[in-house]
């Protein structure tokens, strides 16, 4: 990771944090009525019967986040072809660690929440916000070796793959087979353009990807799946910076960290304290998310990394101390934007959403703070 990209990740993390803080301030000020317009102003896209009519909040969650998952898909494709995921030996341990880091928070959440009304939130504490995590890693500078950062990114990639699968399988509320079939045809068209006709014009995939996204929204499947599958269809050429996948990934990166994620954070992190008592911190859904993110994530990921290192099944782990592995396991508990996103998909009750937001913010802050402390002050030999 070059110096300029490190600066981008650092600045992006600070902007993301500032956007979330601003949302909370605005939603608890005289400007709260303007913040509420995110859910009252509707925007239409389409013609005649082919129309998507959603409020601004949904456009952010269904539109901008689809672009974010397009970017994630491009990253994953690159890593599979030429990066760390291209070698099986490099991915087994991070993949298992990511799965454990998904399962443990979910089990903790379910052990605390038995009410059928809130069980649907089991996946909320299972996510990792890679943007925030990279921002903290950038703050730590040379205290975190490049290989250790790569391990965090690899775990986060598998976490993202799991999140996409969870959203597609568990948070699809209704299904139109006709729209889904049409969306699939546009995906197939992109594959044909790539594999058979060898078309390298990015605009072709942008247009076909847009129609795939449109059909996916109309089908009831969440639009992020269209963004991810579109990315997998876009041509990638090794050592060719001008190939569509490389070009789009490089072009999207600043938009993701400086605009899309901050806008998402601002739109979804605005906790309103009006009518909320301190007791909301001790509600089962809030506690399930806090303990899932702060305890479940670190327990699931660190236990796998430490055990595999001890058994010498994790060669890369031999370069790191257990404290370093524990520090990054803590950082993976920063769920923030991804956890908020799943929370919005799972519930629409205002009180539950406020409890979710508080749980996500507290759990993420605890994970980020203690992860930073461990890696910055407790680890004595970062080399």
Curated annotation (Swiss-Prot):
Major localization listed first in the record, in broad terms: membrane
Location(s) in or outside the cell: Cell inner membrane
GO BP annotations, alphabetical order: regulation of pH
Record keywords, A-Z: Antiport, Cell inner membrane, Cell membrane, Ion transport, Membrane, Sodium, Sodium transport, Transmembrane, Transmembrane helix, Transport
Catalyzed reaction equations: Na(+)(in) + 2 H(+)(out) = Na(+)(out) + 2 H(+)(in)
Membrane-topology annotation of the record: Multi-pass membrane protein
InterPro entries: Na/H_antiporter_dom_sf, NhaA
GO MF entry, a single one: sodium:proton antiporter activity
Residues that span the membrane, as ranges: 10-30, 56-76, 91-111, 121-141, 150-170, 174-194, 206-226, 254-274, 289-308, 327-347, 355-375
Pfam families xref list: Na_H_antiport_1
Any single GO CC term annotated in Swiss-Prot or TrEMBL for this entry: plasma membrane
Function: Na(+)/H(+) antiporter that extrudes sodium in exchange for external protons.
HAMAP family: NhaA
Family, per entry: Belongs to the NhaA Na(+)/H(+) (TC 2.A.33) antiporter family.
Name by which UniProt lists this protein: Na(+)/H(+) antiporter NhaA
Organismal lineage: Bacteria, Pseudomonadati, Pseudomonadota, Gammaproteobacteria, Thiotrichales
Name of the coding gene: nhaA
């Amino acid at each position: 990771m070059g110096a300029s990209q490190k600066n981008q990740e650092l600045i992006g993390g600070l902007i993301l944090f500032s956007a979330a803080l601003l949302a909370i301030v605005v939603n608890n000020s005289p400007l709260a009525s303007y913040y509420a317009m995110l859910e009252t102003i509707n925007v239409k896209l389409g013609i005649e019967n082919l129309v998507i009519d959603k409020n601004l909040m949904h456009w952010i969650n269904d539109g901008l986040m689809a672009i974010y998952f397009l970017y994630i898909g491009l990253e994953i494709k690159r890593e599979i072809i030429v990066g760390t995921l291209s070698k099986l030996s490099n991915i087994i341990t991070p993949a298992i660690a990511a799965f454990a880091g998904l399962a443990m928070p979910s089990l903790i959440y379910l052990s605390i929440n038995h009410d059928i009304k809130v069980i649907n939130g089991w996946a909320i504490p299972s996510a990792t916000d890679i943007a925030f995590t990279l921002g903290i890693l950038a703050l730590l500078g040379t205290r975190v070796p490049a290989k250790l950062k790569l391990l965090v990114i690899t775990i986060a990639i598998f976490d993202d793959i799991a999140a996409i699968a969870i959203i597609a399988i568990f948070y699809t509320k209704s299904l139109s087979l006709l729209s889904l079939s049409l969306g699939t045809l546009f995906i197939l068209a992109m594959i044909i353009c790539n594999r058979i006709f060898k078309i390298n014009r990015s605009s072709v995939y942008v247009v076909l990807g847009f129609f795939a996204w449109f059909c996916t929204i109309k089908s009831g499947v969440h639009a992020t799946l269209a963004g991810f599958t579109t990315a997998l269809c876009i041509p990638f050429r090794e050592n060719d910076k001008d190939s569509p996948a490389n070009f789009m990934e490089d072009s999207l990166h600043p938009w993701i960290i400086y605009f899309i994620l901050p806008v998402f954070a601002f739109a979804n992190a605005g906790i309103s304290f009006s009518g909320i008592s301190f007791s909301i911190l001790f509600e089962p859904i809030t506690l399930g998310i806090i303990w899932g993110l702060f305890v479940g994530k670190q327990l699931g990921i660190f236990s796998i990394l430490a055990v595999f290192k001890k058994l010498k099944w994790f060669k890369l782990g031999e370069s790191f101390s257990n404290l370093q592995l524990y520090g990054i396991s803590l950082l993976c508990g920063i769920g923030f934007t991804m956890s908020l996103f799943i929370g919005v998909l799972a519930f629409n009750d205002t009180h539950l959403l406020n409890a979710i937001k508080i749980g996500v913010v507290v759990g993420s802050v605890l994970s980020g703070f203690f992860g930073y402390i461990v890696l910055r002050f407790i680890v004595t030999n970062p080399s």
